[in-house]
């Protein structure tokens, strides 16, 4: 049974994230979306709110689940019997950051394998940061985030503004 | 009549910005310098101060004007009957950021065209951030910012320091 | 009257090229597609065949024409009263090559301005080289090259194979 | 049963290739090494010689096999009931080439998924080209190619020289 | 007598930094490690603490010393009769930042020469930022920072956490 | 006595090469320009012609000499009591190629240190290839190659054309 972990901030989940989840669910037996609790970064959504948004959009995938975690990612993977981590790649900037991160994780736990997927073309320019900016400035975020959570993002953007 | 918008923070305007403005003024009938009001980022100069500095240095160009704006850039362009945006490119890092931003703008308004110019060689290493650091540390900023505003930048750097 | 030149090998023209031509035709008064005669590189199509393929696909644009040229690009532009060159950008690799080429052209003729457009998302992975490989191996090239010239490319690929 | 294909030229197989094969064999149920027959490129080793070298070094992995193939990669995968392709990533240059290739393959067959692994640190500077150059100039290729095939590479380099 | 300055934040010094110091000490007659006092950035260690950590790990090198400095780097170099600055390069991101910084320094003082060394392979993924994160999350930092200062970093990480 | 080797094809030497030679001559006690004899690549100038052109332009530097060499670069350095190699860096593309080459050289001879200098701004877009193309197409190569050898390059370009 191949269990893969897909870690990130997901503040909020975007169609780019969902694209990776959907494709990974066909390559691995089980996919766990891991929402990182980062004490140094206050996001737009709380960690619990992010987990809730993800739960709603992964319903169509019966081999995908979601949990939040804190501390070292390699420890979270070990606790869930997983030695494969999935990461999306959109650009050269992503590539260099991910190369350094995967080498550090390999140093911390040589059994952990990081596997990458290129984000699908139509989502390759998406980032949670860019989407939050568009939402705060009142732009249309249709096709950028899953339809089920558009209202949640616009409501939060108003509070933020 | 081809109206092009050149958006940015311009905190402060540098010789690299002025180089793009001068070259764009020969390619398009009218150029509007758009100073973005970004509530999340407090700069060295206020937005009004930046607009004033730009007004002083664009005097030689009779087809160039300046305005500040807030909200979505594509809306600002629409209000000024412009469907062409100009951006300068200095490095690979610029390129990737601009690629993602131009694709998001295209998503928000398919009629908007982003056109890029490579910054001239002698200005390719300039950034407002680097110039502010040199000024704060008492370095010489001649040839980095237009001569007309050197004193303004040094005075502001002293307040900042 | 703003005349812009769009130079390249076009061996053959792809939907990525046509995308740039179509968008440039809305930004400039006249666009001249310049097919470079490069004695050092024997392509799949002869230069005349490439010019003919381009003529067929630019019919919908009344402000776009095509010519072949040899020698220095800056001289070809001068002979056509143009001081603006358009180039498409798909990737970091493109960016660096284009940065060096545009700086060399600026050196040869300081009046020449190179203006860049990012290739539209859906064409950002296209290159004449990749399309020729797919055609030679019998793959489907629909949506990769303009419909009008699909048969020409497949016929040439067979000869080539 | 998850079957993954690892395609390449392998002229010759390097320790970087073997590193990817070994790690992939722990992530997927079956791994097929596919040696591409490229009529346009004459290598140092013939395709059959490359297949033979690979056979010798993959003996320790009971879920790994090797075949040569010609034509489109997506067709080769379909004939082997595989919808997952593995590719190694060493550098930014690799990343951009692989991004364009994976998008073209996705266009040719939307069911094909390309999954990437970063080459392990100690092999990240290896390429068949660089190793052939070192061998032709009489340099030491220990730790660059699997021990079992060092003599084959040095013998071929002498013929080549 | 060739005096080279190796400037940085060193918050804290890593094995990547020490690798550059060791190799530079064989190329230049004297190496001065310069710890930059940056009023805008509060680090994990104070500047004095960083100088102390460096003093302990450079003991084996009799031609290497350490000082903190504030203001312009080119002025610090002039005060120490040095016109050569050493910088380490790990990635494309480093390269672009360093290219712009070295061109700005050349502008401020044409006599200053920046010389670069590629970080050794086994340290190429290290950064003070990544190491602090691992330490704060209780991960093992052996082989990431010099053995002599591991306890200092873990103690500081606890305070930080 | 610090002896540094500056290896390359130099087909022909450009002002970018001369810029690196001039700056390196101030950092190291002796600089040897090494012209690589590459059997696989036929250049515009023969190796002897390249050595002659270099001899003419390095006359102002009394600590700079030139030799051609074949085989492994690390062996050439050892024969000249040098453990420092100088390379110029112009772009991200250069950086990645040089990173892999320097790591391979380090593998072949751990005592060899590769030291890099960023090409000066005004020469950052120069390459022997681009200059040869401009010369073959009859463009002006003043300020691109040293004045002393302009006629040699134009004469050779005519033969080539």
From Swiss-Prot, chains A, B, C, D, E, F:
Gene3D superfamilies: HUPs
GO terms classed as biological process: coenzyme A biosynthetic process
Cofactor(s) it depends on: Mg(2+)
Keyword Membrane: no
Subcellular location: Cytoplasm
Source taxon at top rank: Bacteria
Catalytic activity: (R)-4'-phosphopantetheine + ATP + H(+) = 3'-dephospho-CoA + diphosphate
GO molecular function, one term: pantetheine-phosphate adenylyltransferase activity
Enzyme Commission number, as recorded: 2.7.7.3
Signal peptide: none
Record's GO cellular component terms: cytoplasm
Residues with site note (Transition state stabilizer): 17
Protein family membership: Belongs to the bacterial CoaD family.
Protein's name according to its UniProt entry: Phosphopantetheine adenylyltransferase
